[in-house]
Regions:
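Short terminal alpha-helical segments
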Residues: 1-32
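Acidic, low-complexity, intrinsically disordered interaction modules
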Residues: 32-72
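Short, charged, intrinsically disordered terminal tails
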Residues: 77-86
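Intrinsically disordered, low-complexity regions enriched in serine, threonine, proline
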Residues: 17, 27, 57, 76-77
Length: 86
């Protein structure tokens, strides 16, 4: 698994959330990133909550998940559900 790709995914999610004025979620994800590393689950949940899921987000996480041999299966399923609900 490419740690930089995962980190970039979460950093980009933080930017997207800030654009949607989800500042509390963005700050939480930033704190988690600094303290514990990238919180993909939190990023996905926040993207879904704020209606920010796009095909591009799903494709990015699918590529990351493929590299990590299914490590993010649950997060990917949640993101896909968020896309279908959008």
């Amino acid at each position: 698994m490419d740690h930089d790709t995962v980190t970039t995914f979460v950093e980009d999610a933080i930017e997207e959330l800030e654009q949607r004025n989800a500042l509390e979620e963005a700050e939480y994800l930033r704190m988690m990133l600094e303290c514990d590393g990238p919180d993909v689950d939190g990023a996905v949940s926040s993207l879904v909550k704020y209606g920010a899921v796009t095909v591009a987000w799903v494709e990015r996480l699918a590529a990351i998940n493929e590299e990590s041999v299914g490590f993010f299966d649950e997060e990917l399923a949640e993101l896909r559900e968020g896309l279908s609900g959008a």
